[in-house]
Amino acid sequence: GIPVNGMENGSVYWSNWSGLADVTNSIQVQRGIGLSKLGLFSVGGTVNIVTQSTEVNRQGSVYYGIGNDRYQKMGFNLSSGLLPKGWAFSIMGTRTTGDGYVKGTNFEAWSYFANVSKKFGRNHILSLTAFGAPQWHNRRSNKQSIEDYDLHKDGIRMNTCYGYINGQIVPTYSGYNEYHKPQISLNHFWQINGKSTLSTSVYVSNATGGGRKVYGKDANRLQYNYKTGRPNENTSLTPDGLIDYLPVMEDNKNSDHGSDAIFTMGTNSHDWYGLLSTYTNDLSKSLKLTVGIDGRYYKGYHYDKISDLLGGAYYKDNKLAWRDPDTKLREGDKVNQDYLSKILWMGAFAQLEYNREHYKAFVSTSVTSHSYKREDPGKYGAYGNQETYPVANVKTPWSNFVPFSVKAGFNYRFNGMHNVFVNGGYVTKAPMMDNIFVDNTPLSNPIPEKIATGEIGYGFNYRTLSVMLNGYYTQWMDKSVTKAIGSWNGPRACIPNIDARHMGIELEASYQPLEWLRVYGFFTIGDWRWTNDVNFPLFNEQNEKIGEYHAYIKNLHVGNAPQTSAMLGLSCMPVSGLTLGVDFNYYGRHYADFAAADRTDEKDRAEAWKLPDYSTVDLNLNYDFKMGTFRGQLFGNVNNLFNRKYISDALDGSDHTRETAVAWYGFGITWTAGLRISF
C-alpha cells in the first residue's frame, strides 16, 4: 500500500524496483475505477505489490540467466518461513548487466531486499523491510529521422548520444543515468477482533542520483538537436556520426578562460517520509467499512554539479546568485541551478462495501491537502544584486490545494455465470509540482485538474470460458503541462487548462477447451482527443515572460500511445511440467507525440503523423523438474520472433509527415533464458 509514484511529476521509474519480482508474494491489480483494496484513487487503476512475509514457507533459490547482447542476471533468495517463536526472515540479492540492444546502452544494476517479521500472539505482526536497486545505465535520448536509420550502418540500433574517450563509451547529454532509491518501512498488522483490523506503515526513502547534462556556451558541440534528430551546426562528430570529444577537449585544454563545454550531473535526490494507516470493520455480514489516512513529507534536492571538465582546468558560471561569477570551479562544484522542492501531503479516505449473493455495491471518497513550496537561492539575478532580487524572495509561499474524489459502483450477478457492472467517479487533482513552477515563480492562480469518468460492462464465466466486455468514458479537464521549446534547455511553455476526452471499448477473454490447452486474448479500441484550444505564456531561461500564445489543438488525437491494440495467445502443456506459449500482438492508430506549444498556427489543424500499424509474435517456455530434493525451473522468452521492423515512438515534425518526424524503432528479435534451482 505504500505509494511509489514520484511526488513531483507522478512518474513511476521501474528501474528503482528491479528485483522486486523475486520476492513478490502477490500482485493486486485494480483496473479503472472499480472497487479497490486501497483507499488511494487512481483513474486508470492501481497495482499493489505485496512482498514476502510470515506467510511464506521456508525456502531458498539461486538463479542465473542470459540473453541477447551479453545480458546476464544472477541472484539468490532465502526465506526462513515462520520460526517457532514467531520470527521470519527473508533476504534477496541480484546483479544484472548487459550491453543493451541499442548501441552504447550498456548497464549494471544491483538489487537487494531484506525483511524481518515477528508475530506477537495471534493478533499482531510487526514487519521491517528494506529494499533498493542501485543502478547505472547508458541510454539513447535522441530520436532520429527514419531516413537516418535507413542510411546508418547500425540501422534500428542507431544511437547518436555517445562517443569514445580512450576506447571507452562516453555518453553525452541525457545519455547516462544513475540512481539509488532505498526504502525502509515498518509495518504493523493488528487483528483487533473477528471483525476489524488495523494496518499501519511508516516508511522513509532517501534517494540519490541523476542524469548527465552538457553545459557551457559550446554545449551544442556535444549534442544533436532533439526535435530534428540532426546535428547542430557546430556539433563535433566523428566520420561515422558519433560525438567527437577530442576537438572539444583540446579547445578546453588550451583555453585561457576555462572550459567552454563540460559534463554536469543533473541531480534529483530526495528525502521522503510517510505514514499510511488503514482500518477495516465488517459492520455486518454484508457491509464492510474501510477508512484510513495517508500522510507524506517530501524534500527534493535539485542541482547540477560538475562531473567532468573535459580537458579544461576550471569552469566559470554566473547562474547562481550566491556565488561570485569569477570563481574557478572544479569537479563537484554546483552550477546552473540549486533549489529545493518541498511537498506536504495529508489525506483521508473512506470506502463502504455492500455485498450480497447476487449484487455488490460500493461508495468511496477521499480528501487530501497538497502543499508545494520551492526554495531557490541560486536563481535571482547576478551575484550581489540584492536590491532587485532581495534574499527574502528565495522562498516561495506555499501553494495549497485541497483535491477530493468520490466514486461508486454496482455489480449484479445472475444465473451463476453472468454479471453486469457500472462504476463512476469524479476527481479533483492538484497539478503536479513540475507544472506550476517556472523556476522560482508559481503560475498565477493554478487550479486543480478535474476528471469525470464512468464505465459499464458485462462479464460471462462458465466452466472453461470467461469473457469481459466494458466501455469507458473519461473527461479530463484543466490539465497542466510544462514543455521546453526548441531545445532541452530552451524557452518553456507552461500550458494550463487543457481538456481531453478518453473513451473506448475493451474486450478480454479466456477459453480452455482441453485440460492442456488455453486460448486467451484481448482487444481494445479508443478515441482519445484534446477538446479545446488554449492560451499559454512562454518564459525564457531568465524566467522572463516573452509572450502569450494560443495553441490550436482542439479535436486532435492524443499522441504517444496506440489507440487500438489486440493480443491473441495460446498456452499448452504437452507433457507434465512443460508449458509453451505464443502471443500474437497488434498495435494501431498510434499518433506521434507533439507539444501543444508547437501548434500556434490557426491554419494548421492537421493530425500528428500516424505511425504505421504493426504486429509482433512472442514465445515463452517454462519447464519445472526435480533433481533429488531440489526443484528446478528452466524458462525462456523470445520477443519479436520474426524480427519485425516497426516504429514504437515518434515526435511529430513540422508538416506532420513521415519525412519530418523523428522516431525510435522497436527492438528486433530479443531473447532471455534462465535456470532457477529451489530448495
Where are the language model's segments positioned?
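Acidic/polar loop-and-plug regions of large Gram-negative outer-membrane beta-barrel proteins
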Residues: S117, I125-N187, R212-T264, T327-L329
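Transmembrane beta-strands of outer-membrane beta-barrel pores
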Residues: Y64-R70, L82, R95-D99, G132-W136, ...
